[in-house]
């Protein structure tokens, strides 16, 4: 451990003790060295004992800085790791930090583009429009056409900080199984690895640019969602240039009502956008918190969302989409047996899982929820309860499902904030039923044939030759099998004779030994000779 890492570790320990987070460690896990170490640091008392544990954890992460704040935000989506009260507190973490100097941002952009800023942009505002832990945003206009744009710039000093803190997180993750009784099941190293991947993705703005381009193409000319245009010629790994948008923050309910927005339609469109991304496109915006969503000023009675910050996206493969849709439909119908079977068929839980026990566990958790009116049931929390129950049956953590569940909670919470009477189930069920019908009906078959048509048109001229080669290969294989069967039969016959002769030879040799022991003079010699000859004959059959 380097001196800087040691200093950082000491700071982390001091902050954790100042907020009383040693309470997270059960007394039975506090070994003698830990007790001695804690007593040596007697002056580092819990200075926030009047606050609940979840709030203290949130405040400690805020004190440690942006890297730990983002880590806490990610942990808030992993509700299998913490009690609900702690997870709810972690969800309150805000990724807001003071902006760095605009002159430094200018130098960073010029270094990335390889020239003075005025070569490409006019009216660059050195005052940041928005600032977060990884990057900040400045406004400008394109010199070539005068279009208003925003420039997102990675913080110049963030990478070494991230690398140092992530290394420490890995070290701390190694302690978790020793300190917490359920530490191994929580797989702390995998949690840190998942977070590291998310951070690295966010540090590469070319990846975010590609994600935004894909989402924009998926919703081209859609009345539901608008993604700003990316200007790829000016994008680099540490700089992103895209169209500047104007809209009402989706969390500003008063402003939305003031412009007479159709709140019911807006809430329903949020649900439709989510399910369209997941099931039609297999590519969904996985960071849809209110800070990244706006509503267009235009056509408030036909409202349109505007999405920004596409650094984190998720995707599902075809099998996952099908199983997830069938799971949702089974939930709508309260068919818990079907839900249990789908989890096994999909490979999400081990194949030897007891279906009856799994079905009973799902029913126990979910049935009380469905006794409520539909507009009071949280789709996201049903999914959360299902995944937590499945983990008791050794369900492997599915990163794509964790992202999906987090996004669904965002979408549902946002929809209920806009329109409290939102019935997400009624909105989603027809969409899912139509999607499943499209996957198994005649249109799906025709689409599959059309997709494979170029491949088969290329292979069709080769088909007679391939068929002839296959028949010849089958004939040669059959001949080889016949020869092998014949040889095995002969070998089996020879081995049978050999075993027979070995048995006779062994019997004669044993008889000779017994006669020698009872002092009969002549017979043993003859038996030894005969037994030896027969044994040698049997040995020759084995060759």
UniProtKB/Swiss-Prot annotation:
One of the record's GO molecular function terms: ATP binding
Pathway(s) per entry: Cofactor biosynthesis; ubiquinone biosynthesis [regulation]
Record-linked InterPro entries: ABC1_dom, Kinase-like_dom_sf, UbiB, UbiB_bact, UbiB_kinase
Enzyme Commission number(s) of this protein: 2.7.-.-
All copies of domain Protein kinase, residue ranges: 123-501
Active site residues according to the UniProt entry: 287 (proton acceptor)
Coiled-coil region(s): none
Top-level EC class: transferase
Subcellular location: Cell inner membrane
Disulphide bridges: none
UniProt keyword annotation of Disulfide bond present: no
Keywords: ATP-binding, Cell inner membrane, Cell membrane, Kinase, Membrane, Nucleotide-binding, Transferase, Transmembrane, Transmembrane helix, Ubiquinone biosynthesis
Membrane spanning residue stretches: 517-537
GO cellular component term of the entry, any: plasma membrane
Source domain of life: Bacteria
Record membrane topology: Single-pass membrane protein
A GO biological-process term: regulation of ubiquinone biosynthetic process
Annotated residues for binding of ATP: 129-137, 152
HAMAP family to which the protein is assigned, alphabetical: UbiB
Cited function: Is probably a protein kinase regulator of UbiI activity which is involved in aerobic coenzyme Q (ubiquinone) biosynthesis.
NCBIfam families: PRK04750.1, UbiB
Family the entry assigns: Belongs to the ABC1 family. UbiB subfamily.
Protein name: Probable protein kinase UbiB
Lineage, highest ranks first: Bacteria, Pseudomonadati, Pseudomonadota, Gammaproteobacteria, Enterobacterales
């Amino acid at each position: 451990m380097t001196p800087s890492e040691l200093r950082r570790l000491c700071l982390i320990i001091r902050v954790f003790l100042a907020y009383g987070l040693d309470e997270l460690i059960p007394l039975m896990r506090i070994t003698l060295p830990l007790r001695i170490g804690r007593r040596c640091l007697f002056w580092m008392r819990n200075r926030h004992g009047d606050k609940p544990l979840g709030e203290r954890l949130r405040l400690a992460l805020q004190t440690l800085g942006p890297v730990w704040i983002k880590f806490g935000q990610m942990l808030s989506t992993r509700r299998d790791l913490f009690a609900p009260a702690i997870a709810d507190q972690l969800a309150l973490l805000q990724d807001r930090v003071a902006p760095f100097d605009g002159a430094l941002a200018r130098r960073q952009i010029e270094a990335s583009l390889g020239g003075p800023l005025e070569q490409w942009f006019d009216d660059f505002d050195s005052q940041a429009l928005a600032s977060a832990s990884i990057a900040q945003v400045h406004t400008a206009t394109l010199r070539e056409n005068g279009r208003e744009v925003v420039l997102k710039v990675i913080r110049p000093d963030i990478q070494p900080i991230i690398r140092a803190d992530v290394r420490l997180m890995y070290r701390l993750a190694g302690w978790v199984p020793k300190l917490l009784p359920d530490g191994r099941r929580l797989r702390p190293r995998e949690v840190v690895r998942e977070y590291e991947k998310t951070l690295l993705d966010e540090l590469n703005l070319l990846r975010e640019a590609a994600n935004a381009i894909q989402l924009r193409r998926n919703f081209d000319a859609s009345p539901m969602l608008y993604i700003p245009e990316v200007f790829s010629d000016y994008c680099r790994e540490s700089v992103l240039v895209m169209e500047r948008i104007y809209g009402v923050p989706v969390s500003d309910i008063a402003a939305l009502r003031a412009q007479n927005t159709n709140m019911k339609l807006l809430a329903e469109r949020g649900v439709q956008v989510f399910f369209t991304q997941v099931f039609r496109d297999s590519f969904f915006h996985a960071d849809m918190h209110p800070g990244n969503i706006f509503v267009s000023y235009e056509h408030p009675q036909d409202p349109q969302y505007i999405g920004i910050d596409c650094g984190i996206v998720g995707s599902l493969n075809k099998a996952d989409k099908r199983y997830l849709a069938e799971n949702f439909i089974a939930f709508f119908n309260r068919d818990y047996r079907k839900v249990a079977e789908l989890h096994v068929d999909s490979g999400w839980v081990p194949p030897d899982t007891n279906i009856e026990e799994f079905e009973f566990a799902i029913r126990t958790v979910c049935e009380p929820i469905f006794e409520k009116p539909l507009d009071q049931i949280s789709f996201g929390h049903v999914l959360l309860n299902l995944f937590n129950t499945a983990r008791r049956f050794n369900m492997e953590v599915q990163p794509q499902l964790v992202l999906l569940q987090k996004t669904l909670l965002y979408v549902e919470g946002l929809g209920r904030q806009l329109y409290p009477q939102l019935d997400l189930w009624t909105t989603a069920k027809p969409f899912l039923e139509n999607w499943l019908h499209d996957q198994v009906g005649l249109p799906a078959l025709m689409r599959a044939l059309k997709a494979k048509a170029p491949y088969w048109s290329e292979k069709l001229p080769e088909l007679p030759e391939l068929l002839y080669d296959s028949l010849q290969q089958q004939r040669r294989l059959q001949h080889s099998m016949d020869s092998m069967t014949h040889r095995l039969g002969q070998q089996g016959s020879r081995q049978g004779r050999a075993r027979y002769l070995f048995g006779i030879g062994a019997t004669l040799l044993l008889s000779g030994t017994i006669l020698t022991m009872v002092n009969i003079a002549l017979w043993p010699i003859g038996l030894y000779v005969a037994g030896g000859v027969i044994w040698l004959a049997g040995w020759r059959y084995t060759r």
